[in-house]
Amino acid sequence: MARRPVLARHRIDFRNRVNYIGRFAPSPSGPLHAGSLVAALASWLDARAHHGLWRLRIEDVDTPRTVPGAAGVIMDQLRALHLHWDGEIMWQSRRGAAYQQAFDALAARGLIYGCGCTRREIADSALRGTADVDGERPYPGTCREGLPASRQARAWRVRVPPGVETFVDRWLGPQQQDVAAAVGDFALRRADGLWAYQLAVVVDDADQGVTDVVRGADLLGSTARQRVLGRLLGLAPPRVMHVPLIVDPATGLKLSKQNGAPALDCSQPLRMLQQAWSGLGFAPLAAATPEAFLQAAAAQWAQRFGMRHAAVPASPKAD
């Protein structure tokens, strides 16, 4: 008898589920910039090319990094760019109960343990010669068999099973990662009570019924561990596509809020959309309005990545 999925609480009516649900999930640590627009445009086009839904999720789970008012600015930018989302917005800061339920389900199976290690201790561990993944050292498993005497938990980690995780990225092709070796047991909750991004995104994608994740290539390193975590929770993984990053030609660094990327000038939406389209490797489109551009771009995207020669419907506007 097949094991029942742990998270059998989704509020989606799967009898009426569309074949494609995508999402854009910005963090409200500042306004959108040219790099984030590339990811937003790619995910929007992929949803429209598949006649699917495009959800908006505000990833404000890391509350200390949240900038007051930034979420509203992001929504205004998307509207100005004519990238209208479908349905209600999901806010991670309001979903603690959902994350707790997933955490408790894993803990009940002995898959969670407390860890008292500091970042410095992990960096100075026996694995210090191992390559970083997403800027972090792999966790060496110091507390896997129990906290050392006089130590208190600074984080709670999930026990990663052995094995190589393989998947096909729709842009980059076949990928694989030995999560246990490259990442180790990763944190799901911090000592201050904040939930980790990896747990939040897996639970949120499941609750929103997401079938396809289209995002920047800087998040490719998170995919394997998210698939592992989803499988431990009894969830089917979404398809993934990681699109190119936009690099500052002066510094060679990717455009990001941390690197001081300027906010989008949404007073010129067509120019911003054309630049993002170029960043995805497409030739310029002859279009006089943002609506005409998006219609033509979605048709080209469908030819390359979606249902060939399908009519592309106009996007419904968000409320």
UniProtKB/Swiss-Prot annotation:
Family: Belongs to the class-I aminoacyl-tRNA synthetase family. GluQ subfamily.
Residues that bind Zn(2+): C115, C117, Y139, C143
E.C. numbers: 6.1.1.-
GO function term, MF aspect, one: ATP binding
SUPFAM superfamilies per UniProt: Nucleotidylyl transferase
Co-factor(s): Zn(2+)
Cofactor note: Binds 1 zinc ion per subunit.
Segments carrying motif 'HIGH' region: 26-36
Motif mapping: 'KMSKS' region: 254-258
Residue numbers binding ATP: K257
Name of this chain's protein: Glutamyl-Q tRNA(Asp) synthetase
Domain of life: Bacteria
GO CC annotation, single: cytosol
